[in-house]
Amino acid sequence: MKDFEFFAPKTLEEAKGLLHQYKDVPPAIIAGGTDLVIEINDRWEKPDVVIDIKKLKELEYIRVEENTIHIGALSTFTQIENHPFIRSHVRALYKAASQVGSPQIRNLGTIGGNLSTSSVAGDGVSAMTTLDATVVLESVRGTRQMKLTDFFDGEGFKRRNALEADEIMTEVIIDRPDAHSASAFYKLAKRKSLAISVIGGGMAVKVDDAGVCTWASMRGGCIGRYPLHFKQAEEMLVGAPLTMETMEATLPILHDTVYDMARARPSVLYKKESVQGVFKKLFVDILDQLEGGCNE
């Protein structure tokens, strides 16, 4: 391991100042360290400057407001998993948070780190994309908000997302669900814990008083560089009564979309079939919630 300069700012303003000061290096940010420490030990990352932001307690919160939920970037997966409102009302996020790594990893890993790392297999990435999340990025230059999907499409200093070298993700915002909405997440993996997703499927819907779908979001993680958008399947659901029959009618579209996206990969033969099984489980969960079933 090479030597590097290490800083542990106590305030967000101090952290932004350090990021600006060393932006040309550029610095590596560490929070939980569940990704960066491994990358440094394996010599994938060789930073000259490391900024530890774990002391920034001002970024560690979950705030439920009238129409939105605000999650500080330093909120751990354990904190998200154990939050009463998220557990009972935001099932996609609860399920994703509860299946990240192991209890030890969930105690350290943060939602901001998960999204900023932008791993293909990130459970938080799949869930938050499904929920149409917005992220907040801050620097001494100012603050900007963008949809998570736009964040992933950006080309920042690491070319993996829109984050610039002097920026820090401070918050994630999602819509607060109501009685006419539901979300679900299912992680297909080789083991029940300490496993990387094979497919991380996410689904969210809104319906009217008659049970007709007014909005749908369907995403498949670990299929492409970022969660695959099943846009054609969503369009089939919107305007139709949300029943098992109408949802299962989208399965051939899911199959074909995965094949078209990943046909050059050896895993496509497995994933184009298994994605249908993943979403069948999501359909059951969605209907259970809309019909007043158990949210646990």
From Swiss-Prot:
InterPro entries: CO_DH_flav_C, CO_DH_flav_C_dom_sf, Diverse_Substr_Oxidored, FAD-bd_PCMH, FAD-bd_PCMH-like_sf, FAD-bd_PCMH_sub1, FAD-bd_PCMH_sub2, Mopterin_DH_FAD-bd. Keywords: FAD, Flavoprotein, NADP, Oxidoreductase. It catalyses: nicotinate + NADP(+) + H2O = 6-hydroxynicotinate + NADPH + H(+). The keyword Protein biosynthesis does not apply. Pathway: Cofactor degradation; nicotinate degradation; 6-hydroxynicotinate from nicotinate: step 1/1. GO terms for molecular function: FAD binding; nicotinate dehydrogenase activity. Pfam families: CO_deh_flav_C, FAD_binding_5. Binds 1 FAD per subunit. Signal peptide: none annotated. FAD binds at residues 29-36, 101, 110-114, 123, 160, 169, 187. Its cofactor is FAD. Its EC number is 1.17.1.5. Most stable at pH 8.0. Unstable at acidic pH values. Catalyzes the hydroxylation of nicotinate to 6-hydroxynicotinate. Also active against 2-pyrazinecarboxylic acid, but inactive against other nicotinate analogs. Heterooctamer of NDHM, NDHL, NDHS and NDHF. Dimer of heterotetramers. This is Nicotinate dehydrogenase FAD-subunit. The lineage of its organism: Bacteria, Bacillati, Bacillota, Clostridia, Eubacteriales.
